[in-house]
Amino acid sequence: MGNSKSKSKLSANQYEQQTVNSTKQVAILKRQAEPSLYGRHNCRCCWFANTNLIKCSDHYICLKCLNIMLGKSSFCDICGEELPTSIVVPIEPSAPPPED
């Protein structure tokens, strides 16, 4: 009766991918701004922050400005696109790999 397939348990990585795929707007947190041809990226709203940036369509915004904008509406004041509501924090090593 019904479906005889058993449900397999998802690993932590598969669960994270499933939850990331199910959300609408997902952004990756940039701890350090990546240099470009024209210099470093800064927050397009306050122009001061160059760490902990979130990419919004074609520009970067800092966490402080993102929180302020999300308090007002779900759309960006600069580009008019929907603001990211989920942030994926990449795991970065805190020390260099051990030498053999």
UniProtKB/Swiss-Prot annotation:
<dbReference type="GO" id="GO:0016020">
    <property type="term" value="C:membrane"/>
</dbReference>
<keyword id="KW-1035">Host cytoplasm</keyword>
<keyword id="KW-0479">Metal-binding</keyword>
<keyword id="KW-0472">Membrane</keyword>
<comment type="subunit">
    <text>Interacts with protein NP; this interaction probably directs the encapsidated genome to budding sites. Interacts (via RING domain) with polymerase L; this interaction inhibits viral transcription and replication, Z partially blocks the product exit tunnel for the releasing nascent RNA product. Interacts with the glycoprotein complex; this interaction plays a role in virion budding. Interacts with host eIF4E; this interaction results in eIF4E reduced affinity for its substrate, the 5'-m7 G cap structure.</text>
</comment>
<keyword id="KW-1188">Viral release from host cell</keyword>
<keyword id="KW-1043">Host membrane</keyword>
<dbReference type="InterPro" id="IPR038485">
    <property type="entry name" value="Z_RING-type_Znf_sf"/>
</dbReference>
<keyword id="KW-0946">Virion</keyword>
<dbReference type="GO" id="GO:0003723">
    <property type="term" value="F:RNA binding"/>
</dbReference>
<feature type="short sequence motif" description="PTAP/PSAP motif">
    <location>
        <begin position="93"/>
        <end position="96"/>
    </location>
</feature>
<dbReference type="InterPro" id="IPR003224">
    <property type="entry name" value="Z_RING_Znf"/>
</dbReference>
<keyword id="KW-0863">Zinc-finger</keyword>
<dbReference type="Pfam" id="PF03854">
    <property type="entry name" value="zf-P11"/>
</dbReference>
<dbReference type="GO" id="GO:0044423">
    <property type="term" value="C:virion component"/>
</dbReference>
<dbReference type="GO" id="GO:0044220">
    <property type="term" value="C:host cell perinuclear region of cytoplasm"/>
</dbReference>
<protein>
    <recommendedName>
        <fullName>RING finger protein Z</fullName>
    </recommendedName>
</protein>
<keyword id="KW-1187">Viral budding via the host ESCRT complexes</keyword>
<keyword id="KW-0519">Myristate</keyword>
<dbReference type="GO" id="GO:0008270">
    <property type="term" value="F:zinc ion binding"/>
</dbReference>
<keyword id="KW-0449">Lipoprotein</keyword>
<dbReference type="InterPro" id="IPR024183">
    <property type="entry name" value="RING_finger_Z_arenaviridae"/>
</dbReference>
<dbReference type="GO" id="GO:0046761">
    <property type="term" value="P:viral budding from plasma membrane"/>
</dbReference>
<comment type="similarity">
    <text>Belongs to the arenaviridae Z protein family.</text>
</comment>
<comment type="function">
    <text>Plays a crucial role in virion assembly and budding. Expressed late in the virus life cycle, it acts as an inhibitor of viral transcription and RNA synthesis by interacting with the viral polymerase L. Presumably recruits the NP encapsidated genome to cellular membranes at budding sites via direct interaction with NP. Plays critical roles in the final steps of viral release by interacting with host TSG101, a member of the vacuolar protein-sorting pathway and using other cellular host proteins involved in vesicle formation pathway.</text>
</comment>
<feature type="lipid moiety-binding region" description="N-myristoyl glycine; by host">
    <location>
        <position position="2"/>
    </location>
</feature>
<feature type="zinc finger region" description="RING-type; atypical">
    <location>
        <begin position="43"/>
        <end position="79"/>
    </location>
</feature>
<keyword id="KW-1032">Host cell membrane</keyword>
<keyword id="KW-1198">Viral budding</keyword>
<dbReference type="GO" id="GO:0020002">
    <property type="term" value="C:host cell plasma membrane"/>
</dbReference>
<keyword id="KW-0862">Zinc</keyword>
<dbReference type="GO" id="GO:0039702">
    <property type="term" value="P:viral budding via host ESCRT complex"/>
</dbReference>
<keyword id="KW-0945">Host-virus interaction</keyword>
